[in-house]
């Protein structure tokens, strides 16, 4: 089975790739993350992923749309509910690309995170699969999250401190009282 794996970052991807390869899945990575801001953060995560992909011979498709304005426009009306829009943007584009490029299925490294809303992501991914008539390969990768983080530290990957959007970065600092609201 040929699967297109949407990748948010190398620390999340490494154990997803390893798990899928162990299952005999032929994995190709897909970088599409218009939610990641600022540009320096976007570039750092993308470059780390490129290095990781090369080191494990992971084919990588990049859709380098640094899209601050379109992303903010998409989520501005409901900042608190932005995650569903973010999942939709990335998972629908992954399904579309997978279909267009002849893959059997798609999935995402987002499913490794204990911090993401798995049920919501599954629902969005299934809608994307139905829309583009391609299989959504669901795997709950959370059990290998810690192994992925350990691998990332061992290989000196860039380790981000927030999910990617400027709003999650703001929340990170508000929770630690590092900025004044």
Locations of regions flagged by a protein language model:
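Nucleotide-activated chemistry modules centered on ATP-dependent adenylation/adenylyltransferase
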Residues: 1-181
């Amino acid at each position: 089975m040929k699967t297109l794996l949407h990748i948010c970052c190398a620390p999340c991807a490494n154990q997803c790739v390893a798990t899928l390869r162990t299952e005999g899945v032929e994995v190709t990575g897909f970088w599409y993350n218009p939610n990641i801001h600022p540009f320096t953060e976007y570039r750092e995560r993308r470059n780390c992923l490129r290095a990781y992909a090369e080191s494990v011979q992971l084919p990588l498709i990049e859709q380098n749309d640094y899209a601050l304005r379109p992303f903010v426009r998409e989520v501005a009306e409901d900042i608190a509910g932005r995650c569903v829009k973010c999942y939709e943007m990335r998972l629908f584009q992954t399904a579309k690309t997978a279909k267009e490029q002849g893959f059997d299925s798609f999935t995402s490294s987002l499913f490794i995170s204990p911090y993401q809303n798995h049920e919501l992501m599954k629902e969005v991914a299934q809608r994307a699969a139905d829309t583009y008539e391609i299989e959504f390969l669901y795997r709950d990768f959370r059990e290998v999250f810690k192994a992925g983080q350990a691998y990332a530290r061992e290989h000196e990957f860039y380790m981000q401190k927030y999910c990617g959007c400027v709003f999650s970065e703001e929340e990170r600092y508000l929770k630690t009282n590092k900025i004044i609201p």
